[in-house]
Amino acid sequence: MSTINKNILESLKGELKRQQDHIELIASENYVSDAVLQLSGSILTNKYAEGYPDKRYYGGCEFVDQIEKQGIELAKKIFNAGHANLQPHSGSQANEAVYRALLQNGDKVVSMSLDAGGHLTHGYPINFSGNNYDFKFYGVNRETEEIDFDEVRKVVLEHQPKLIVAGASAYSRIIDFKKFREIADEVGALLMVDMAHIAGLVAGGAHPNPMEYADVVTTTTHKTLRGARGGMILSKAEIGKKIDSSVFPGTQGGPLENQIAGKVQALYEADTPEFKEYVHQVVANSKAFAKALADNGMRLIANGTDNHLINLDVKNTLNVTGKDAEKILESIGIVSNKNMIPFDTEKPFVTSGIRVGTAAMTTRGFKEEQFVEVAKIIASALKDQSETNLNTLSKEVAKLCKQFPIYEHLSY
């Protein structure tokens, strides 16, 4: 078959139009470059390459070796890491590989609770991490909604974990990695940082680099780093062999060389002045967005943001669940996601909050002015859900999208 199946093609066209016509505020999403798109869909998808560069279990790997080697060196340079592995298929698999490399089943681990901003793979009971290891949790201060380091230290001293996990999927403030290191050293624990959300900010100098303090750092490559979908592990040189063995053959077989090429392209892009300008704009936009949301009567978790994301409490201020808020906003062309907030009493599929981010629309060209306008639209939609108001707001969203087009050259 030399053409795309018509049923798939119809959905593909629909998705292109959706991306073009919606304001994308999901904090974990971004728009990749044309080069990343090309590499992800390139002939590299045909190549099997179990193993690592120059140590493969298949022949014909000289060119994929070249690409992967470039990526390893770039990642080490950008993040000041002793070792880098680009093969994890996802952030979750990167986390799994690290756990398998450093822990035995049943070992104690301390991490951030899900409602405070942690991730499923940080010990949530229904996840493999919660099943295989003995996780204990820290959270945030009830007043400031920022990480409660007194609680972190208390939990760590009480349970004497082998590993401490810092990092989150919904935390809007700078994380003090130095404090985590100091607490880890009190009990001789290893420190892992999951920087999936902030990797691009770290690469561009808009957030402190966790490699300065962590033994190992995991990340996705498709959020603020703006690369092909996948994962990556950075570590101190002395544990590099353990990490590599845990990825292959421990948890994966053949790597996705097309996706690795897309990751490497993104790393090349991240190592430029233009990318540094981009991530600083992401943070500037986020701060302006947060202020405008607050000015329009929205309650911000942790009273603001230092990175690309903002968590909003919609249930306790507007009497709208996160689930309903997500639907209301999507009906006018704004895409966000329902999200738990600290001490949330709602179920994870309902939630009291929503999470929004600035990475994707900053890629599209939005500056502070546009995010102030979006904040007003969001507040208006959640406060007045009348058909007349939502229709008016939908037109405003469409106008903004038209002013900042994306992927105009693509046609399917």
Swiss-Prot record:
Superkingdom field: Bacteria
UniProt key word Lyase: no
Protein name: Serine hydroxymethyltransferase
Swiss-Prot/TrEMBL keywords: Amino-acid biosynthesis, Cytoplasm, One-carbon metabolism, Pyridoxal phosphate, Transferase
Family note: Belongs to the SHMT family.
Protein role: Catalyzes the reversible interconversion of serine and glycine with tetrahydrofolate (THF) serving as the one-carbon carrier. This reaction serves as the major source of one-carbon groups required for the biosynthesis of purines, thymidylate, methionine, and other important biomolecules. Also exhibits THF-independent aldolase activity toward beta-hydroxyamino acids, producing glycine and aldehydes, via a retro-aldol mechanism.
Binding site for (6S)-5,6,7,8-tetrahydrofolate: 114, 118-120
Organism phylogeny: Bacteria, Bacillati, Mycoplasmatota, Mollicutes, Entomoplasmatales
Gene from which the chain derives: glyA
